[in-house]
């Protein structure tokens, strides 16, 4: 066989994480995947991380205060925000940027007709890595637009972007949509919501667990604090745990259109009979409206085990890949295909610690504290619930937030105060507002 000169092989301009490169190890030539090569280079390189990433020290095991702070290259966080915001996305993936200060018009000044698509939040893939600081011993969540080892969150365009409903999901005919000026849909099972999302096309689904982790990352990056309600606003349910649902159910999406891609709140009055809400507001997380405190949201990409199933103990958390929901057989055992497993806390209570780990799992690990300490949110769980809900509703007041979770309900559960948020997992084509409206 003739020898081949590596220097004469075909040049390429890009590679995948799964591709391999040649390296010298102990005097011998070896192959290594690009992903493992990046991890090896970056392993333990704290100075590099401080240059290219911003970090949040996760101090849950050392303090009850919710103030964690932000370290590293905070200018990189400012830059990341510039690439994020609201777009109108058509069913086939054409996306036009809306004005960053007024979601009634596109960035080019063209008036928005929401019936031609869905109002979605789009942001670039975000790399993350959890690494224990060598000096303080505190785990730090490092985030960057650049590869830093660890993992990344990106569900659309081959993993290059995240595309999440800016508003809570509502119904237009048989389709789940993300539009302003309508009441969010409820009283449907997760399967019914997912099927309604699929009416838009096979690349449409519901917000998944990874995207909920991303929303948590955004909140921590902006405030360096786990108590999002105290920093941004308490949401529709306010700061006191009163039954405000009947009044909250009459509210409509799009209250934050005037806030565009910014962080902020709009104070509102919510009165349900003799119950008057305190500190009620509509909140906006750089274009994502009301991710907590109004209506629970179903999550795809995750389910829990049930002690009623012979193959499960009820402590399992299954996190699986793909824009799909589990089958009945999977719910009774484990997901098919690629998945990983974690262990859930099966007691309800205030969230003192999250699982964290290398995957930045945001399920509760330890219960304790109150609504102003540790993670400042409440979790509902047991050994039989398989559904995963996130964010809390207008019954729960200060118990709601970005760490507020529920895994205590059976799979076919439905309630008016439980809804969904649309997500898109396909390819995106970026166009101007004028061309999108003219099509």
Question: Positions of the model-derived regions?
Answer:
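Short, intrinsically disordered N-terminal pre-domain segments
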Residues: 1-18, 436-439
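A short, polar/charged loop-to-alpha-helix boundary motif
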Residues: 305-322
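GGW-centered surface loops in extracellular recognition modules
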Residues: 45-122, 128-130, 439
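Short hydrophobic/aromatic-rich beta-strand motifs
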Residues: 18-25, 287-289
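Short aromatic-cysteine micro-motif
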Residues: 110-117, 142-291, 295
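Short, surface-exposed terminal/edge motifs of secreted or surface/virion proteins that either
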Residues: 23-43
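Short, flexible beta-strand-to-coil junctions
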Residues: 22-29, 57-62, 167-170
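C-terminal, surface-exposed recognition/capping segments
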Residues: 54, 211-213, 234-258, 262, ...
């Amino acid at each position: 066989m003739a020898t081949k000169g590596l220097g004469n092989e075909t040049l390429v301009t890009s590679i995948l994480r799964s591709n391999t490169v040649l390296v010298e190890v102990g005097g011998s030539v070896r192959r290594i995947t690009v992903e493992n090569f990046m991890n090896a280079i970056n392993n333990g390189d704290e100075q590099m991380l401080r240059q290219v990433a911003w970090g949040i020290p996760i101090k849950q095991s050392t303090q009850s205060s919710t103030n964690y702070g932000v370290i590293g290259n905070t200018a990189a966080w400012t830059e990341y925000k510039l690439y994020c915001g609201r777009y109108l996305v058509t069913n086939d993936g054409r996306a036009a940027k809306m004005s960053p200060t007024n979601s009634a018009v596109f960035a080019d000044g063209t008036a928005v007709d929401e019936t031609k698509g869905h109002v979605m939040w789009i942001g670039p893939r975000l790399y993350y890595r959890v690494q224990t600081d060598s000096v303080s011993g505190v785990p730090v969540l490092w985030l960057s637009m650049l590869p830093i080892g660890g993992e990344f969150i990106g569900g659309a365009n081959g993993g290059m972007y995240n595309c999440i409903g800016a508003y809570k999901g509502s119904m237009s005919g048989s389709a789940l949509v993300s539009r302003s000026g309508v009441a969010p849909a409820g009283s449907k099972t997760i399967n019914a919501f997912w099927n309604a999302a699929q009416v838009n096309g096979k690349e449409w689904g519901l917000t998944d667990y990874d995207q909920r982790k991303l929303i948590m990352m955004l909140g921590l990056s902006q405030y360096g604090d786990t108590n999002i309600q105290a920093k941004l606003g308490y949401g529709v349910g306010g700061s006191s745990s009163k039954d405000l649902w009947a009044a909250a159910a009459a509210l409509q999406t799009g209250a934050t259109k005037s806030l565009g891609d910014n962080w902020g709140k709009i104070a509102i009055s919510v009165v349900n009979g003799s119950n008057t809400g305190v500190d009620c507001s509509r909140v906006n997380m750089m274009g994502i409206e009301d991710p907590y405190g109004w209506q629970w949201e179903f999550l795809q990409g995750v389910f829990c085990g049930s002690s009623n199933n012979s193959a499960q103990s009820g402590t399992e958390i299954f996190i699986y890949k793909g824009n799909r929901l589990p089958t009945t057989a999977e719910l009774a055992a484990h997901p098919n295909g690629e998945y990983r497993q974690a262990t859930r806390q099966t007691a309800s209570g205030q969230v003192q610690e999250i699982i964290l780990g290398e995957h930045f799992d945001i399920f509760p690990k330890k219960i304790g504290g109150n609504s102003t300490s540790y993670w400042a949110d409440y979790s509902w769980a047991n050994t039989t619930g398989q559904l995963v809900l996130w964010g809390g509703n207008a019954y729960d007041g200060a118990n709601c937030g970005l760490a507020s979770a529920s895994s205590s309900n059976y799979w076919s559960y439905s309630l008016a105060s439980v809804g969904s948020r649309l997500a898109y997992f396909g390819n995106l084509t970026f166009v101007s507002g004028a061309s999108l409206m003219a099509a």
